[in-house]
Design a protein with these regions (language model features):
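Short beta-strand/loop motif that positions the catalytic acidic residue
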Residues: 100, 106-108
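Active-site-adjacent alpha-helix of alpha/beta-hydrolase-fold enzymes
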Residues: 22, 108-162
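Conserved acidic catalytic loop of the alpha/beta-hydrolase fold
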Residues: 43-57
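Short, surface-exposed "cap/lid" segments of acyl-processing enzymes
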Residues: 1-23
Length: 178
């Protein structure tokens, strides 16, 4: 289940979701949020997971604000959720996942000027010790999705396709761990 970034349409993550589905053989659900803000429905994954009762193991994740909400959801979720993907995101101060047993991957573009890097680093203290971190060299904030440039973001020095290829590879590695 993938939560979109704040004020970003879920369809903006369709290329990423499609690549995960095709390359990983996994079903991917893009969560539609009220006003395109996951903060208004952080529990949206419940309905998506309940609609697919044949799937026993789930990973939740999200981009930016959607990632913070996915982390909060993962903290309080049932045992169906086994992993967490954070794309240019970190858990809120109130979200403690260090002892959660979740498999986690956290990705950030080296040119991301939207995420406050010291706060991202502090968020790592609330994640499991075996969290996999990947800084995508040349990547930025917006290229985790397909919604164009984002005000305040850095200029990517790699293509969106390259950034998403690296993102998919990291997510597929996580899928292999659960």
């Amino acid at each position: 289940v993938l939560y979109p970034g704040g004020r970003v349409a879920p369809e903006s993550y369709a290329p990423l979701a499609r690549a995960i589905a095709v390359e990983g053989g996994a079903e991917v659900a893009l969560a539609s949020m009220p006003l395109n803000l996951a903060v208004f429905d952080p529990g949206r994954a419940d309905a998506l997971m309940d609609a697919a009762p044949g799937i026993q193991r789930w990973i939740v994740g999200g981009h930016s604000l959607g990632g913070a909400m996915a982390a909060a959801y993962a903290m309080s979720s049932d045992d169906r959720v086994r992993g967490l993907v954070l794309l240019a995101a970190y858990p809120a101060d109130s979200t403690e996942l260090a002892d959660s047993g979740l498999a986690v991957v956290s990705l950030l573009g080296s040119e991301d000027d939207v995420v406050d890097r010291p706060t991202w680093d502090e968020g790592a203290e609330r994640l499991p010790a075996d969290t996999v971190y990947l800084i995508i060299e040349g990547g930025n904030h917006a290229q985790f999705g397909d919604y164009g440039e984002q005000p305040g973001d850095g200029v990517a020095t790699i293509s969106a396709a390259d950034q998403q290829r690296q993102t998919v590879a990291a997510i597929l590695e996580l899928l292999g761990r659960i």
